[in-house]
Design a protein with these regions (language model features):
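Bacterial N-terminal signal peptides
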Residues: 9-16
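N-terminal leader/linker segments that initiate helical-solenoid repeat arrays
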Residues: 22-51, 58
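Ankyrin-repeat-protein effector appendages
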Residues: 22-34, 159, 196, 205, ...
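Ankyrin-repeat boundary/"N-cap" motif
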Residues: 27-36, 59-72, 96-107, 132-141, ...
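Conserved ankyrin/ankyrin-like repeat signature
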Residues: 45, 81-82, 117-118, 151-152, ...
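Ankyrin repeat domain, specifically the short helix-to-loop turn at the C-terminus of the second helix
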Residues: 50-57, 84-93, 120-128, 154-163, ...
Length: 230
């Protein structure tokens, strides 16, 4: 009798574990299918699967070391329609992507992709144009300058990004947008940064100034522009 009871309990436990495994697999399938729909721009499949995801803000990874929320995947694949749909679903914009060290917001991903439409959307919804992504001064404006994206740089400045960056945040380096723009030899970006008040006399922790970088590149136009703005 005891052996029968033990066997019965074992079968019940096995059944519960099997159900749990099936539910977990089904949950994974809905995540995978939703991500696939986002990537392919399949709105019908997106709507069909997203309703089965309990927490759209949970970070989920497939075959990479990085993890994304549903909004993060929508930004990754630059699907504006689904981005807007997820925002209507109250998706969190402050943590949509994570690597081994940091968690990044939706604005980070939009700037990283150089997608001016998404950048404008997130800024209009209150995203912080001066958010710090690390202790070395990485911020949206530094990113846009690094990517040579003039339209995104203009948008960030229009929405209050500090033309001088975030200054010293206690890291090993200080990153100034103007230094980056000069290093990229992008005269239009240099002009817009100066227009919004970027200082020409800043120096990084190695002592280099914007004009030093311009001279190293032998960019006469930028050298003249910086000298005139002193």
């Amino acid at each position: 009798m005891n052996m029968k009871r033990i066997a019965f309990l074992f079968l019940c436990l096995f059944g519960l574990l099997s159900i749990g495994h099936c539910q977990e697999k089904q949950s994974f399938d809905h995540y995978y299918l939703t991500i696939k729909a986002i990537k392919e721009g399949n709105i019908s499949d997106f709507e069909k699967n997203i309703k089965h995801i309990k927490n759209i803000d949970s970070l989920f990874h497939t075959d990479t070391d990085h993890s994304y929320t549903m909004l993060g995947y929508a930004c990754l694949y630059q699907n504006k329609h689904i981005v807007q749909r997820l925002i209507r679903m109250k998706a969190n914009m402050e943590c949509v992507y994570s690597d081994d060290m940091y968690c990044y917001d939706a604005l980070y991903m939009a700037v990283d992709k150089g997608n001016a439409e998404l950048v404008k959307l997130f800024l209009s919804l209150g995203a912080n144009a001066n958010v710090a992504y690390n202790e070395d001064g990485l911020c949206p404006l530094v990113m846009s300058c690094s990517m040579n994206s003039y339209p995104v740089t203009c948008l960030l400045l229009q929405y209050g990004a500090k033309a001088n960056g975030l200054d010293n945040l206690g890291g090993d380096y200080i990153t100034y947008p103007l230094m980056v723009a000069v290093d990229k030899n992008n005269i239009n970006m240099v002009k817009i940064l100066l227009k919004y008040g970027a200082k020409t006399k800043v120096r990084d922790k190695s002592g280099k100034s914007p004009i030093f970088v311009a001279r190293r590149h032998k960019n006469v136009e930028i050298i003249k522009l910086l000298e005139k703005s002193r």
